[in-house]
Amino acid sequence: MNDPLVELPLSFQHMSMAGGIRAAMYRSPDKVAYKHGDRTRNYRDLVNRIDRVSAAIIGDLGLEPGDHGAIVAGNSIEYMEVVIGASQAGVALATVNPKLAPAELVDICDDAEARV
């Protein structure tokens, strides 16, 4: 039924989330990649935005692969773009619920050793 040990095709093994999205873009650039509410993003636009986020994380924020960061945000298309863009840049993100108390936010960011 829902066997969690389904073997993936070789082309999917060892592929990052950003790599999988990029591969889908090459196959179907105009296909809807993500929908949140009434907003959508096709694969071409999603890859473009993920690339821009990755570049900003490295260039503007000064983070490097291996660094840690945090994002405090609700679910949105932009949230997904930041999480995947950070992953593509090699930055591990702690995803933090914006409804938490400020002290909890600080504790989570401290535990995650988030630079930003």
Model regions: which residues?
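A short N-terminal helical cap/helix-turn-helix that marks the beginning
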Residues: L10-V32
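Structured binding elements
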Residues: G90
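Short beta->alpha connector loops at strand-helix junctions that form conserved
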Residues: V96-P98
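Active-site charged/polar residues at nucleotide-handling catalytic sites that mediate phosphoryl
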Residues: D111-R115
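Short, charged, surface-exposed hinge/linker loops at domain edges
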Residues: M1-S11
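Conserved AMP-binding/adenylate-forming core of the ANL superfamily
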Residues: Q13, D30-I84, A101-V106, D110
